């Protein structure tokens, strides 16, 4: 049987997301619910994949089915493609399985040409509307299909408005729009070198190809990488008969949410534009009116819309984001989807849905996107400083949080300034999908145009970046990189502060502070604790970090890097002495100076953890990282050691390694300098004894982690030193104290021989940063130079240092667990690389049987 590449809306349902994409599946579901949906068909995601397999061509079989379904659509609507009497006009939209806002653009009014425009103008008696549709279609088709930039057309519109002395597009007459259409066609011919296509079927195939092609455009690739959307999914294409919101003042278009996407409050929220088409609202070209005003303008359509909202929210049991059009006072639903929301709103909505009996606690936890929880810990303005400040303007608070930075006017500048360590606020007329990387590099985004559903607002909310949109008081001069607001001129590099929760804009610097956690957060985390089996620890080297992580729910420290403690002023001198010593005795003497500091550090950590486990990794970096590089520091060290500057330079030179990542580091240091491991063991055990004495109700049980082992004999050698030293300390103190000695699995050989290593270890902890480096043979610091080329060539979809490679590195981890646990049934296993905070990596760790993950404090929730 031939493949089915095309489905009518009436042939699908919400469970067919993989095939029909999110938009197509939801249009089918709304059709099934009997809602007023302009009919059409969906070309499947498989057709997109096939398009790429066929060398970016739509093959004859797929084209044949599309033509077949155009005929079916003509039968359903009673209109004909390209017909003078009763022409069928359609919209063409992309729709991947996962929503990708602003990534794939829409084409409206497809099927128009000069003949059809004249016909619909005569038939409707509304020439202005007909020519408005045509000029929009030429502009969208040129931009989306042929990739002629929007700006050329916007400039022609702005010039026309200036010539006619009007402010708004809606003030242009039918003749003005007719003239614009011919100017647009001339622009098209100049840029493309051929006439604008008149044949509706040629237009349609061009548009479908453009949607497929846009699946692989740079901004889609960036968005997919950031949101774990596989390239292999492809996008569906939805071809839908047009409903017109721009036929006159009894028409309009809008976007609405069944709950507030910024706060989660249960009330209808959205925006509506009279005499406009859908893209006008989403693109933020005109600033719309609130949805409540629609009730005065179109009472019957509004009443029906409120009922539809309730039907959809009850059906999907989640907050819905809907697009709709009113044509001659009749309502048409164009799409629905689970609405994107801020992290605060996500928590409130999930809790409210449980309270309303629509969701279980377990379902509510599953509704929360873990990546969004980062944004809950958003900076806010310092309360005292905020009280003293007066806003210079107020616009729409489109994405919460507070931002303060230097003004930049382009996405490129935002990236450049951010790369050199400057905090920036990106100020734009409106953002477009090309600005995504610049938006990521900014502390906050401020736009002149656009509402709560504009591109800037939607993308900023998704990224957790503060955004204020629709500040019409700004008089922008992009060419000269300046704007005027409240009588003051602002230039590139001037400071500005914006509040994405209130929409307030402030002149100058207002300091920000970290956020605190609100009540719903606690409820959701409590439910999550009920259902989870994986423990969560934190990577922390200081008591302050440990305290913060405990507040956020960490159940212990999974990685304390002791080397960070050596860099403090009072210790580094002694440590350098140790490095430059000639004898064991001299080294021990220098280490003796560091011992009380290390012990104090560990005591403070145990205090902060209140009896929760603390895993202390012994010295890992190569010694060359600790020696001085400045001439003055070298002189000081020479004087302290009673050596010449030349001798010290000779020692430093001797520490130089060609490949330090694989050099003299980790437990190799303990093999060559056992006295370092002895000193660290004494500090760990003495600190534990002291804190245990002070708090008899706590169980202080240190976990000593030996890094970088690759052989069981090597691990045994160092473990024996640690155990002998620890047991001697415990005996001398006359106390009982349990402790564990484990190792990091960060070399492939350690994973391959984990059965042998498990005989010597109480626990394994995967150091996935190094394990990834060693498995791939990539240096983490240098991989950035070539990874972009790997993404472009579709060799990799993700940075393996950000998202765990489950196929290679993951296989080694699974192997280590399967080999280690039978040999040592009490072996507990964790992960402490950066991957410990990445949601998809954590899911994998759970699947292969890890006991805990450890991540930075702010990623604990």
Residue locations for each model-derived region?
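Nucleotide/phosphate-binding sheet-loop regions of phosphoryl- and nucleotidyl-transfer enzymes
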Residues: 1-389, 416, 422-425, 432-437, ...
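Short beta->alpha connector loops at strand-helix junctions that form conserved
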Residues: 41, 448-450, 469-472, 560, ...
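Conserved alpha/beta-domain cores
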Residues: 93-94, 517, 527-860
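Flexible inter-domain linker/hinge segments
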Residues: 208, 215, 377-408, 523-529, ...
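Structural motif
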Residues: 238, 408, 425-427, 446, ...
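Glycine-rich phosphate/ribose-binding loops and adjacent secondary-structure elements
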Residues: 329-332, 429-440, 444, 452-458, ...
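Extended, non-globular alpha-helical segments
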Residues: 394-434, 485-523
């Amino acid at each position: 049987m031939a493949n089915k590449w095309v489905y009518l809306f009436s042939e699908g349902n919400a469970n067919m997301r993989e095939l029909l994409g999110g938009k197509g599946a939801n249009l089918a579901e709304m059709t099934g619910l009997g809602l007023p949906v302009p009919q059409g068909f969906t070309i499947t995601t498989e057709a997109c994949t096939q398009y790429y397999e066929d060398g970016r061509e739509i093959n004859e079989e797929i084209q044949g089915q599309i033509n077949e379904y155009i005929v079916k659509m003509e039968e359903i609507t009673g209109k004909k493609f390209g017909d003078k009497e009763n022409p069928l006009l359609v919209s063409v939209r992309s729709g991947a399985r996962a929503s990708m806002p602003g990534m794939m653009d829409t084409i409206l009014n497809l099927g128009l040409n000069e003949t059809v425009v004249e016909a619909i103008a005569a038939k409707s008696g509304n020439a202005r509307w007909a020519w408005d549709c045509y000029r929009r279609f030429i502009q969208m088709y040129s931009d989306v299909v042929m990739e002629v930039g929007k700006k050329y057309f916007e400039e022609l519109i702005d010039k026309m408005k200036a010539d006619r002395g009007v402010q708004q597009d809606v003030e242009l007459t039918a003749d003005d729009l007719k003239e614009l259409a011919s100017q647009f066609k001339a622009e098209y011919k100049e840029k493309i070198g051929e006439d604008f296509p008149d044949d509706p079927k040629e237009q349609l195939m061009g548009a479908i190809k453009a949607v497929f092609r846009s699946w692989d455009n740079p901004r889609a690739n960036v968005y997919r990488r950031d949101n774990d959307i596989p390239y292999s999914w492809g996008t569906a294409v939805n071809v839908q008969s047009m409903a017109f919101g721009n036929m006159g003042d009894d028409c309009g278009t809008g976007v609405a949410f069944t709950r507030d996407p910024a706060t989660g409050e249960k009330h209808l929220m959205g925006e509506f534009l009279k005499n406009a088409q859908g893209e006008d609202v989403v693109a933020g070209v005109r600033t719309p009116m609130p949805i409540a005003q629609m009730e005065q303008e179109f009472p019957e359509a509004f009443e029906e819309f409120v009922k539809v909202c309730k039907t959809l929210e009850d059906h999907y049991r989640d907050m819905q984001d809907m697009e709709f059009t009113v044509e001659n006072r009749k309502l048409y639903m164009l799409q629905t989807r689970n609405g994107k929301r801020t992290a605060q709103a996500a928590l409130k909505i999930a809790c409210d849905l449980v309270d309303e009996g629509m969701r279980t606690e377990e379902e509510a936890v599953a509704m929360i996107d873990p990546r969004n929880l980062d944004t809950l810990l958003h900076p806010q303005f310092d309360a005292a400083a905020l009280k003293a400040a007066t806003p210079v303007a107020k616009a729409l608070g489109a994405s919460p949080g507070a931002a303060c930075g230097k003004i930049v006017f382009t996405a490129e500048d935002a990236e450049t300034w951010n790369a050199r360590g400057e905090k920036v606020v990106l100020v734009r007329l409106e953002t477009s999908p090309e600005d995504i990387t610049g938006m990521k590099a900014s502390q906050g985004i401020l736009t002149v145009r656009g509402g709560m559903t504009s591109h800037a607002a939607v993308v900023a909310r998704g990224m957790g970046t503060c955004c204020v949109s629709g500040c019409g008081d700004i008089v922008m001069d992009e060419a000269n990189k300046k704007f005027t607001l409240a009588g003051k001129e602002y230039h590139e590099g001037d400071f500005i502060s914006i509040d994405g929760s209130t929409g307030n804009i402030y002149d100058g610097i207002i300091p920000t502070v970290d956020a605190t956690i609100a009540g719903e957060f606690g409820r959701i985390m409590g439910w999550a604790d009920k259902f989870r089996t994986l423990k969560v620890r934190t990577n922390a080297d200081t008591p302050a970090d440990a305290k913060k992580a405990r507040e956020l729910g960490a159940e212990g420290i999974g990685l304390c890097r002791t080397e960070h403690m050596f860099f403090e002023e009072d210790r580094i001198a002694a440590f350098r002495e140790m490095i430059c010593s000639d004898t064991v005795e001299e080294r021990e003497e220098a280490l003796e100076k560091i011992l009380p500091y290390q012990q104090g550090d560990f005591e403070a950590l145990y205090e902060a953890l209140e009896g929760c486990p603390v895993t202390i990794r012994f010295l890992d970096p190569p010694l060359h990282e600790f020696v001085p590089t400045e001439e003055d520091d070298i002189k000081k060290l020479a004087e302290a050691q009673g050596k010449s500057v030349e001798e010290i330079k000779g020692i430093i030179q001797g520490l130089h390694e060609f490949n330090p990542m694989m050099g003299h580091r980790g437990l190799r240091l303990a093999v060559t300098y056992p006295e370092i491991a002895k000193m660290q063991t004494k500090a760990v055990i003495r600190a534990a004894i002291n804190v245990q004495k002070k708090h008899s109700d706590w169980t202080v049980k240190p976990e000593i982690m030996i890094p970088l082992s690759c052989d069981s004999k090597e691990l045994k050698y160092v473990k024996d030193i640690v155990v002998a030293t620890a047991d001697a300390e415990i005996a001398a103190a006359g106390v009982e104290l349990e402790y564990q000695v484990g190792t990091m699995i960060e070399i492939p050989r350690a994973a391959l021989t984990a059965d042998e290593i498990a005989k010597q270890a109480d626990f394994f902890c995967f150091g996935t940063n190094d394990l990834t480096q060693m498995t791939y043979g990539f240096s983490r610091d240098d991989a950035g130079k070539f990874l972009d080329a790997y993404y472009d060539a579709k060799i990799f979809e993700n940075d393996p240092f950000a998202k765990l490679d489950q196929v290679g590195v993951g296989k080694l981890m699974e192997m280590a667990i399967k080999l280690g646990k039978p040999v040592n049934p009490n072996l507990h296993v964790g992960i402490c690389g950066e991957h410990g905070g990445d949601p998809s990596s954590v899911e994998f760790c759970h699947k292969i049987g890890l006991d805990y993950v450890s991540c930075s404090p702010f990623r604990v929730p």
